[in-house]
Amino acid sequence: VTSDKAVCGTDPAPARLTVGIVSAGRVGSALGAALERAGHVVFGVSGISDASVYRARTRLPDSEILPAEEVARRAELLLLAVPDSELAGLVSGLATADAVRPGTIVAHTSGANGIGVLAPLTARGALPLAIHPAMTFTGHDEDVSRLGNACFGITAADDIGYAIAQSLVIEMGGEPVRVAEEHRTLYHAALAHGSNHLVTLILDAVEALRAALAGPGLLGQQLVDDQPGGLAERVLAPLASAALDNALRRGPSALTGPVARGDVDAVAAHLNALESTDAELAAGYRALSLRTAQRARTNPALLELLASPSDRRDAAEGSDQAKEGN
């Protein structure tokens, strides 16, 4: 229950709340466990899939597994932790069923959405919050502990809402960061670009390393195979970890390597070697090398090498038109 001071606006931090979660997926169950550690009571969760039910029983053993509408009706803090594509439909359904009481704190965990998606419930007296953990969740035990190192993008309707969201995030061990409603999509795109695409980059590099390391090795050397955590990953890990650390701490000065140096011959050789291994992997290398070259403001000849055939064709046509104009 929210304290009387919070209602008056003098102390907006939430007291111990009765929490309901829809649904008990990777994110919802992890946040629920973190809220319980802070002293809140997660009375109930909804879970449809076997995996969600298992996570609920494992991470939140004292919580009942209930239909979403019943969870919503009984909650003082309702946490909507469903995929982005399902959020608007869930909110609409709860509003139509009149399942959320006035005064209920309703928070969703979507990165791309602000509080606008909660408008049907806000119109019925709910207090809307967007609380997105900038963290990847695997469903394993480390999810909850990782929240202690995570920032949360929060959006609210007013100062009271921001204070409540901030307090909840701090209680879960995270760091709250204010994100304007109109910037939520950009915020989410940036995080997806820096995390999801990083995984693809690493997997591509591992694939190329496996091909490069295949064949006879040193006495006692681990054989190269397709299993995660193998030799290719061990070779790449220190370099990739150092590169990420340098990029986060030093910015553009962390750029090194043949693209940053403008070494056309080395990059051309890389492209040829990668093409013989996997054309799609080579295309990814070309695209990222071009972006790297643009950031490094490197050798124009390298930019020309890395430009796509259509870009080179457009540039040539533009040059021809300029000559004709003269």
Describe every region a protein language model picked out.
Residues 1-73:
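NAD(P)+-binding Rossmann beta1-loop-alpha1 motif at the extreme N-terminus of oxidoreductases
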Residues 2-14, 97, 211-230, 312-326:
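Intrinsically disordered, low-complexity terminal tails and inter-domain linkers enriched
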Residues 29, 33, 37, 58, ...:
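Short, well-ordered alpha-helices that flank and scaffold nucleotide-derived cofactor binding pockets
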Residues 50, 54, 58-60, 64-142:
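Rossmann-like NAD(P)(H) cofactor-binding subdomain of soluble oxidoreductases
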Residues 2, 13, 234-326:
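NAD(P)-dependent Rossmann-like dehydrogenase/reductase catalytic/cofactor-binding core
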Residues 38, 56-59, 121, 142-246:
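Internal alpha-helical scaffold of NAD(P)-dependent oxidoreductase catalytic cores
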Residues 18, 40-44, 75-78, 102-106, ...:
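Short active-site oxyanion
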